[in-house]
Amino acid sequence: EIKPSYNITPSQDVLVYDGKLHYMKWAYNPYWSKKKLNLINCRIETMSQKPSFKKAERCVFLLNGWYEWKRENNEKQPYYFTNYKLFFMGGLKNNNGCCIVTKQAKGELSLIHHRQPVILKFHEINNWLTGSHSFQTKIDNEIKILKVSKKVNNTANNTKDNIVKKK
């Protein structure tokens, strides 16, 4: 059963696809690590060289948007990034969990944060899973950025109100 969520945080279960649709813990731990690293992101530029990801498999996160915070007037302000549709992010996984693959942010997205997820279109999913694509998708231009309430800082607030544009 797919459950809507409006405030997923690291270490919670996220919906992923890796040939089948299922939930996984959003916190990646290398198979060799004796202590929990709980990695939530991986840079696409270095993922093939980092020992942490040597045996990782690819997966795809399914979502409608994500949050980033920007420091404004000495406070952190949350923003919601969306295209108002289901979209997909490149990820890595193992038996211990999963993480989002990021790249250098482009355009308006870079005004909020210097990194962004690798965003995929539906027809790119199989190429991502097989590792045969450079992922220069134009979907980045379709992402809208909404200033939202600071209520998202509390994981107990998990309602549609979180993704309403702040006035």
Question: Language-model features: where?
Answer:
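Short linear sequence motif anchored by a di-proline
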Residues: E1-K167
